[in-house]
C-alpha cells in the first residue's frame, strides 16, 4: 500500500502510520490494520470483537475509532485485544540507539495501568497515574512525567536520540532525560494497546499511531499535533 497523502503531518522518517479513521488504513472489516507509511508495517488485530456500531472491543463503525476493552480478571492477558506489528528491517531503524519517535492519540475510558505500546527489550510507553517512557536493553531506564491526568483524547509523543529523550503531551514537553542505552534486542514484535500477548491492556481508544526512525523536533511534534487535533475534538 502506497504512502497516504492526508493531513499535513511530518513524513520524514515515518516508518509506521496506522489511522483507523481512514478507510485505506482500516477498511471496516478484517484483522489487518494497514500501514499508510509505505513500509508495509501492517498491524494484525488480536481478540477484537467488532466491527459494530458502538463497539468497545474493536472498530466502532459509527466513530471510526479503534476501541480496546480490557477483560478484567484475565491474569494472562490472552482474552484482551491488542495490535501486533511484526518485526521488519524498517522497524529495526527505530531503535533508541538510532533515534526514534512515537506519536499516538489515546483516550482512556476506564482507568487502568496500561501499556500503550511496547517493543520488547527496546522501548515501552505506559500509563499508571503518570506517563513513563521506558528504554530497555543495556543501560535502559524509565523517564517519568509524574502525576499526569489524562481525560478525553490526548496526543502522546515520545522522542529519543542516542543521548537524550523527551515526553510530550499535546505538544508540550512534560519530561526530559538522558539516555544511556548501548545495546538492544531487535527481533520482537511491536504491540499497541497492551503487551504482545495481551497483558496490561488498555480500556479506551487508540485509533492513530505513528512511529518514526528519528527524533522529531519540538516544532515537528507541534506540527503533528496541530494537524490532527481538530479530528479529536481539541
Give the ranges of each region predicted by the language model.
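Extracytoplasmic low-complexity segments
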Residues: 1-79, 221-234
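Extracellular glycan-interaction patches encoded by glycine-rich segments
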Residues: 1-2, 89-90, 136-144, 186-207, ...
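Extracellular glycan-recognition modules
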Residues: 28-29, 33, 37, 46, ...
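Beta-strand-rich interaction surfaces with strong enrichment in secreted/lumenal proteins
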Residues: 91-93, 143-148, 179-180
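Short, aromatic/His-centered strand-loop micro-motif at the edge of beta-sheets
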Residues: 132-155
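Localized edge beta-strand/strand-to-loop motifs within extracellular or lumenal beta-rich domains
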Residues: 152-166
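Short, solvent-exposed beta-strand-to-loop segments that form ligand-recognition rims
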Residues: 170-190
Amino acid at each position: 500500500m502506497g504512502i497516504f497523502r492526508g493531513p499535513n503531518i511530518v513524513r520524514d522518517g515515518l516508518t509506521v502510520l496506522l489511522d483507523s479513521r481512514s478507510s485505506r488504513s482500516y477498511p471496516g472489516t478484517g484483522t489487518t490494520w494497514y500501514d499508510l507509511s509505505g513500509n508495509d508495517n501492517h498491524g494484525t488485530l488480536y481478540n477484537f470483537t467488532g466491527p459494530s456500531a458502538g463497539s468497545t472491543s474493536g472498530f466502532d463503525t459509527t466513530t471510526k475509532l479503534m476501541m480496546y476493552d480490557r477483560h478484567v480478571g484475565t491474569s494472562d492477558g490472552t482474552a484482551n485485544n491488542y495490535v501486533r506489528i511484526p518485526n521488519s528491517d524498517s522497524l529495526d531503524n527505530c531503535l533508541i540507539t538510532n533515534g526514534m519517535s512515537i506519536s499516538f492519540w489515546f483516550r482512556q475510558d476506564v482507568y487502568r495501568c496500561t501499556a500503550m505500546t511496547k517493543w520488547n527489550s527496546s522501548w515501552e510507553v505506559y500509563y499508571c497515574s503518570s506517563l513513563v517512557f521506558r528504554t530497555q536493553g543495556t543501560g535502559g531506564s524509565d523517564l517519568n512525567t509524574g502525576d499526569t491526568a489524562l481525560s478525553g483524547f490526548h496526543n502522546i509523543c515520545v522522542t529519543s536520540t542516542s543521548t537524550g529523550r523527551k515526553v510530550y503531551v499535546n505538544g508540550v514537553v512534560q519530561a526530559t532525560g538522558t539516555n544511556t542505552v548501548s545495546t538492544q534486542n531487535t527481533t520482537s514484535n511491536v504491540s499497541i494497546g497492551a503487551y504482545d500477548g495481551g497483558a496490561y491492556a488498555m480500556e479506551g481508544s487508540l485509533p492513530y499511531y505513528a512511529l518514526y526512525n528519528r527524533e522529531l523536533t519540538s516544532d515537528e511534534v507541534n506540527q503533528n499535533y496541530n494537524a490532527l487535533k481538530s479530528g479529536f475534538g481539541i
